[in-house]
């Protein structure tokens, strides 16, 4: 049972030593805004030198994989391959490719509530997008899925169009994630994809299929490409309701870092309430603290 224990000393060396790999969330864990968390790039280098696999799981649907890789490089995280990066946009593209692609005469289009990064990921998967300028308006395919991602230009008109498509019972409703809000550098919050997905669900009377954390579908996407033993893998994140719950659902050892969204007090409140799937096994002040576990 997870008890939210401080990870240090002999326990730290044991937990990190036994781990074959580590899954990291990104924002609030590796960086905040445009600044890397102190010691984070060095930790990833040390993990690689120790032969520990590192993979990265983000609910951010704003960036396609190549753009996300550039962000890693810009913030000082070198030596990573784009194949190590898994976003909710990438996972949504995988799911829709599985569900929609078939013979040319049966392929449908995706109506997207989201930005260009999400659209780029879908195009890279060979999917057709409703309203895409490259499509012939006279030969536009039927919309067979509505995808809700992070959309800075969400509007009543877009909501209405999404609901019109969803009146077709065979039209899928997919959301990249349910994060309700995201923190800004000034301490304020901006609505997240979860807020937009809730609006579409309420207006359409439909329930979205969610691909990002805490859905195990994201772990399924990872295991398609990497051999991961969840019993010997750490899930390190900053949000209890997504990262830590995801880790528990997938059978990993969970570590909360206190450089992001969730606080130690929130974790302890979940522990007191018996909501153990939202309680990390361990916590650290920063992921830089994990380097002690790699020392000889």
Curated annotation (Swiss-Prot):
Pfam families: Hydrolase_6, Hydrolase_like. SUPFAM superfamilies: HAD-like. Substrate binds at residues 58-60, 182, 213. Divalent metal ions. Mg(2+) is the most effective. Detected in brain (at protein level). It catalyses: pyridoxal 5'-phosphate + H2O = pyridoxal + phosphate; pyridoxine 5'-phosphate + H2O = pyridoxine + phosphate; pyridoxamine + phosphate = pyridoxamine 5'-phosphate + H2O; O-phospho-L-seryl-[protein] + H2O = L-seryl-[protein] + phosphate. One of its GO terms (biological process) is regulation of cytokinesis. One of its GO terms (cellular component) is ruffle membrane. It is found in: Cytoplasm, Cytosol; Cytoplasm, Cytoskeleton; Cell projection, Ruffle membrane; Cell projection, Lamellipodium membrane. CDD domains: HAD_Pase_UmpH-like. Its main location: cytoplasm. Its EC number is 3.1.3.16, 3.1.3.74. Keywords: Cell membrane, Cell projection, Cytoplasm, Cytoskeleton, Hydrolase, Magnesium, Membrane, Metal-binding, Pyridoxal phosphate. Mg(2+) binds at residues 25, 27, 238. Belongs to the HAD-like hydrolase superfamily. Homodimer. This is Chronophin.
């Amino acid at each position: 049972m997870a008890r939210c224990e401080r990870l240090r000393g002999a326990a730290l060396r044991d937990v990190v030593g036994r781990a074959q790999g580590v899954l990291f969330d990104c924002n609030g864990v590796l960086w905040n805004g445009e600044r890397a968390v102190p010691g984070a790039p060095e930790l990833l280098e040390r993990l690689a030198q120790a032969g520990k696999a590192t993979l990265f799981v983000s609910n951010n649907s704003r960036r396609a994989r190549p753009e996300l890789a550039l962000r890693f490089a810009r913030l000082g995280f070198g030596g990573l391959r784009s194949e190590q990066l898994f976003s909710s946009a990438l996972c949504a593209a995988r799911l829709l490719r599985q569900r929609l692609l078939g013979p040319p005469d049966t392929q449908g289009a995706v109506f997207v509530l989201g930005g260009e990064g999400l659209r780029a990921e879908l195009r890279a998967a060979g999917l057709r997008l409703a309203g895409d300028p490259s499509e012939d308006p006279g030969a536009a395919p039927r919309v067979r899925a509505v995808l809700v991602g992070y959309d800075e230009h969400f509007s009543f008109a877009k909501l209405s169009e999404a609901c019109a498509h969803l009146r077709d019972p065979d039209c899928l409703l997919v959301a990249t994630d349910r994060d309700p809000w995201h923190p800004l550098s000034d301490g304020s919050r901006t609505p997240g994809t979860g807020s937009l997905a809730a609006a579409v669900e309420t207006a359409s009377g439909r329930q979205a299929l969610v691909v990002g954390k805490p859905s195990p579908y994201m772990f399924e996407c990872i295991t398609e490409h990497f051999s991961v033993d969840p019993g010997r893998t750490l899930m390190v994140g900053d949000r209890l309701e997504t990262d830590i719950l995801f880790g528990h659902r997938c059978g990993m050892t969970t570590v909360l870092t206190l450089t992001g969204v969730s606080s130690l007090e929130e974790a302890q409140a979940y522990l007191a309430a018996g909501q153990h799937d939202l309680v990390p096994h361990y916590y650290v002040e920063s992921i830089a603290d994990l380097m002690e576990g790699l020392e000889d």
